[in-house]
Design a protein with these regions (language model features):
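Residue-level signature of mid-helix packing/kink "hotspots" within the transmembrane helices
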Residues: 12-20, 107-108
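Flexible cytoplasmic inter-helical loops of multi-pass small-molecule transporters
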Residues: 145-163
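Helix-loop-helix hairpin linking two adjacent transmembrane segments in secondary transporters
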Residues: 98-149
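Hydrophobic core of transmembrane alpha-helices in multi-pass small-molecule transporters
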Residues: 56-74, 182
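Extracytoplasmic gate region of multi-pass secondary transporters
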Residues: 172-188
């Protein structure tokens, strides 16, 4: 379906564009603010798919724009950076590995649950259940706090977002990495 494909294209574009914004928000105000903000967009997108009109521009706004913005702050990058800041170097790898494993298990269970729910209850009720899951995540994100000063955690810099972008785009390996991901999206 063209409308669905276009919405997913918008979603992926918004995810990529808003990820750095949520990263800057997390650095400046704390991971919980970035994740809560993203969960609000994500939850509204799913909720409006459940309750609102779902044709034309509304579908593109709900499925593409709102959910895409929400993914920018709830997908793996922002939560992993928050987890990384909570642990000293000696235990950071194991902590991040556990979070990645739990997230991957969620990716494994989600299609199974979704398929079952769609067959048994239909798409509307399935969207309602996902709205409840996201509300749970929204409340859980409230309890994510910035870590207190830990001696073994390296000192963070006071670099601004603009300075960080400038430094990144002067680094050849970063430009190659971004180019690789950019090319990946041309199939959309």
């Amino acid at each position: 379906n063209t409308a669905f494909g276009f919405a997913i294209g918008i979603q992926m574009l918004m995810w990529g564009l808003t990820g750095p914004i949520f990263g800057a928000l997390a650095d400046r105000y704390g991971g919980h603010i970035a994740i809560i903000s993203a969960f609000i967009f994500y939850t509204l997108g799913i909720y409006f798919l459940y309750t609102g009109p779902n044709t034309g521009i509304y579908f593109q706004i709900h499925m593409g724009l709102l959910i895409g913005i929400g993914l920018g702050g709830t997908a793996i990058s922002i939560p992993m950076s928050v987890v990384g800041k909570h642990f000293p170097l000696s235990t950071r790898t194991i902590a991040m590995s556990i979070v990645t494993a739990i997230g991957s298990f969620g990716y494994f269970l989600s299609p199974i649950f979704t398929t079952y729910s769609l067959k048994e209850y239909g798409w509307n009720y399935t969207l309602f259940i996902f709205t409840l899951f996201l509300i749970t995540g929204l409340f859980a994100a409230y309890f994510v706090r910035s870590p207190s000063e830990i001696e073994s955690v390296e000192k963070t810099s006071d670099q601004s977002f603009k300075e960080a972008l400038s430094e990144a785009f002067k680094t050849k390996s970063y430009i190659l990495l971004v180019s690789g991901f950019f090319v990946c999206g041309f199939h959309i």
